[in-house]
Amino acid sequence: EILGYGNTNDAYHMTAPQPEAEGITNAIKQAVSEAGIPSDAKLYINAHGTSTPLNDKTETLAFKKSLGEQAHTALISSTKSMTGHMLGATGAVEAIASILALKNGIVPPTIGYKEPDPDCDLDYVPNKARHADIDYAISTSLGFGGHNACLVFGKAE
C-alpha cells in the first residue's frame, strides 16, 4: 500500500540537479515522514538512478541527508539499468518494481555496475538480485527542470 508521498520542484536548471540535493532531499523527507518509517526499518530504495555522474552523486547525497544512517543500511538499485529510461512510463514501472521487491523479498540489481564512484558509497545491489526481508520500499522519480517525487510503499495488511 502507498504510505507516503513527497514532491518538490527546485527549478535549479533545465537538466542538471541542484548540487546540494535540497529538492530531492525534501521530497524524500516528506514521503518518509508521512509514512512514519521507524529508524530501524529495513529499506529498499528504487533510485531514479540514471547512471550519470551528476544525478547519481546528487541522489546519493539526498539519500544520506534525508535518511541519515539508515541510508547506509538500505538496499538501493536502479531498475533503469535493465529497462532503460522510459521517460513518462518510468515512475509507474519503477513503482511496480518497488512493490514486487517488497512483496517477494527479492531486490532487483543494478546491472552493469563496474566502477563505483567514491561519492556513491552506498549499497547499490551490484549486478545480482538479492533476497532480503524489507519493511518498506521507496521509489524516487526526478524530472527535467527540478521535478522531484518520492513514494513509500509498505506491505498490505
What are these regions (language model features)?
Residues 1, 26-40, 61-82, 90-144, ...:
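Structural signature of cysteine-dependent C-C bond-forming condensing enzymes
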Residues 1-35, 44:
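Condensing-enzyme catalytic core mediating Claisen C-C bond formation in acyl metabolism
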Residues 4-11, 49-51, 80, 142-143:
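Glycine-rich beta-alpha junction loops
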Residues 12-20, 24, 50-67, 86-93:
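Short glycine/threonine-rich loop-to-helix capping motif typified by GTGT followed
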Residues 43-52, 79-87:
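A short beta-alpha structural unit
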Residues 54, 151-152:
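Generic hydrophobic alpha-helical membrane-span motif
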